[in-house]
Amino acid sequence: MEQRKVLECSGKNGLSISDLILVAILLAAGAVLKFFVGSMFSMGMKPNFIIAMYCLSILIIRPKFKDAAIIGLIAGAICQFFPGTPYINFISEFVGAIVMAALVRIPYGTGKRFSLIPIVSTFISTLASGFTFIGIMYMVFYSGADIKPVPLAIFMGIILGTAFINAVIVQILYVPLKLALKK
């Protein structure tokens, strides 16, 4: 008589279809915001709302680090469709997504109805992405590439302003979206 073994896999292996759809919709919304709303703030640079949307998606779906890294790389690829410094966003959005994935894993122990985790995590992740971007850009500039540097004070204003805007957007959207998705 033949004995059969049944193996069960516990834990999820990658993102579900609904998680992928959520990430796609939020990244698309971030691209639209970057294109239209970012134009209003244009001083040669545009705030990057794509960061807010990948932070929101990582906050809601809480992916593994490898999945968060892929979300960051996809966000970097989407940023390539917009004018600016090419290719740097691949690295900066990767770093921002990994930082966000790390921050959502910290056990904060808040049992309160209102949490500041979304606003704080998004602010820090946006800073990580922005500082990575400016660091790489200045390294490339000072290594002899033909890139015109924007004064550091302007970049700092853009990074801090974008971090603030992204943090507020994510804080406002987090609870309603989480409730709507029943997560």
Regions found by a protein language model. Give the residues of each.
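Hydrophobic transmembrane alpha-helices
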Residues: E2-L59, A97-R105, Y174, K178
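Membrane-helix interface "capping/anchor" motifs
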Residues: I58-I71
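Alpha-helical transmembrane segments of integral membrane proteins, especially early/N-terminal helices
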Residues: M45-S57, T85-N89, I124-A128
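Interfacial aromatic-anchored transmembrane helix boundaries in multi-pass membrane proteins
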Residues: V32-K46, I74-R105
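Short helix-perturbing small/polar motifs within transmembrane alpha-helices
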Residues: E2-S10, D19-I25, I71, I91-Y138
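Membrane-embedded alpha-helical hairpins and interfacial helices in multi-pass inner-membrane proteins
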Residues: Y87, I91, G111-K183
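Hydrophobic transmembrane alpha-helices of multi-pass small-molecule transporters
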Residues: A52-L56, Q80, A97, A101, ...
